[in-house]
Amino acid sequence: MGFQADPINMFRGLPYLPRDHKALQSPPLYEVLALGPRPGSGGGYHRPMFSYRHAFHAGNHADVLKHLVLIATLRHLTQKPTPLMAVDTHAGAGVYRLDGDQAETSGEAQDGIVKLTAAGLADPAPALADYLEVVASFNRAGRPRLYPGSPFVIQKLLRAEARDKLKLFEMHPTDIKALVGHMAQLEAGRQVSVARQDGFESLKALLPPPQRRALVLIDPSYEIKSDYTKVSACIQDSLKRFATGTYLVWYPLIPRPEAHDLPRRLKTLANQAGKPWLHATLSVGQREEAPQAQMPGDAPHRPGLTASGMFVINPPHTLKPVLAAALPQLLQVLGRGRGKGQTLESGG
């Protein structure tokens, strides 16, 4: 089993704080995280590909779906005693504050993990209960103030005794600095490696893995259209290099042709390779609110992301039944109004 997070002491000596910082005596984790420049602090970036910051979106409904699927998949893969290599091609900062400026500016976590935790489901589906327990392990009792990103989720579930490995890639200049610092506090040693490299390209050198077992999470920001074609090209190349790996692709369901074409393309690639696949989507729908009057010159109201999907190639045979039980409960709690729904299909 991976590192067991202690929300009081796990970040003792965080490198972003001075060594004599008072919080180091008994620091709540949420008080010592350093996640880079705040909005308006002058820490801007000159390249468009670096405009996306996941800290604004951490813990939203898309993260809930992604990590629900990720945890359920890892639980199955780690039942075998043989080593596993896990890869996150777009790792982000690793862990996020839900009470920080970025999360509070967007408010997206309120309609995701915060709402789900507050719902207090009497009989949550096993996969949903497992997900909530993983998030809770990084927090004090009550409302979550920290949200573990995929690197923290994966590392927590990997096993030191089995010599599982985790490879993390991130290109954002601020997020990679935060990621290195955050992962160092887990004291995972050689189990985890972090690199400021293009995850799409770097994955090629890792396949096939010496362990002969791999889980690969691919979740770029999709802020540029080429990300969609890069994802499908990455899957096509990866299946040629290592056809038996388990590949998880997250994508946003937005009114863009590339977004709707991506799952169709992934189905085709899986079918051509003769591999099974699973496709899950969650749409929380539009808010049922009275429209607000706009003044002349105001920017049009944008509802934000309301739906996303997870596409899994070579899914565990246990994944579909556990999601079939969990997704309706997710929709029950997180669904907001017109357009809400969930789907689950498989093939191969």
Which residues does each PLM region occupy?
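Short, positively charged and aromatic/hydrophobic N-terminal segments
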Residues: 16, 25-28, 32, 41, ...
